[in-house]
């Protein structure tokens, strides 16, 4: 028995001696890290705490309520998918994103696969159409190749693709009407996402795909809705936004806008499943003052009793529309309310007030622009 004990102790001591010391492990790790960087380039592997670029930056969406739902705005260097029914505000939402990027000196591109971009409406939302890069590709392969080259250049800050449903494969265009092309668009999107996703992260360019809804056949239970282009985009997208029209805004019998509701269906950079609501006015886009009033009421800066809104004990308007008009006419009070709202929102929140453009300045800028005709509805 004593022999067995001695042999066990000796084997244990041998195993302890065989283990590398902490200093040797660090030396070996640094050696292999250096070898990887020499083989694949600097930055191919890193410690997460040492990489400043791993902190995801954001830029505003144009609606403060949506900025808060997203944790600050759209993430830079990520893929975003915006989907919803027709005339729910998808294109309007992305045009506001383009305007925000251009306002900060960035370069924007719009891949108009649907061939339906309205330059007059885009200009009314604040888009600098003279410096906006626009492409109207003939095929889906051409559109995605253009996106890939723009992303690789690292000179473009945002690319919008309108829409995935309009990215028609070349084989389908060259074929005849009625020819079956099962899964061709899904294969195209899957290949494209594999190719461009890595370059998107390296360049810091945000790529926003607009998508349409379809109904799955034979679904009895559950939601029958699905998006076009297969499942690849769902996996590669860091943020997915489901936008819906929940109300039509009217003055008497005249329709002047819609109430939109956005659900963050997926978010890899902030908590998901948050909901934001805002008004989209025909010819003017997202109502920044409407967003401010909603958040002022939610935070208690503005009190609503019945139909009346009050600020600091004084009634400022009866009904939502009259209160927004009062805010437009009283810029000083508007700025005071905005400051108070931001103070309330940033208490214990990761979203900083500096990460969002002041709404008062945005509202004054929008008020100076002439509204286009009501024919330019929310896309």
UniProtKB/Swiss-Prot annotation:
Function summary: Can catalyze the hydrolysis of ATP in the presence of single-stranded DNA, the ATP-dependent uptake of single-stranded DNA by duplex DNA, and the ATP-dependent hybridization of homologous single-stranded DNAs. It interacts with LexA causing its activation and leading to its autocatalytic cleavage.
Primary location: cytoplasm
Domain of life where this protein originates: Bacteria
In Swiss-Prot or TrEMBL terms, this protein is called Protein RecA
Its annotated compartments are: Cytoplasm
Which Pfam families has this protein been placed in? RecA, RecA_C
InterPro entries, alphabetically?
AAA+_ATPase, DNA_recomb/repair_RecA, DNA_recomb/repair_RecA_CS, P-loop_NTPase, RecA-like_C, RecA-like_N, RecA_ATP-bd, RecA_C_sf
UniProt source species: Prochlorococcus marinus (strain MIT 9303)
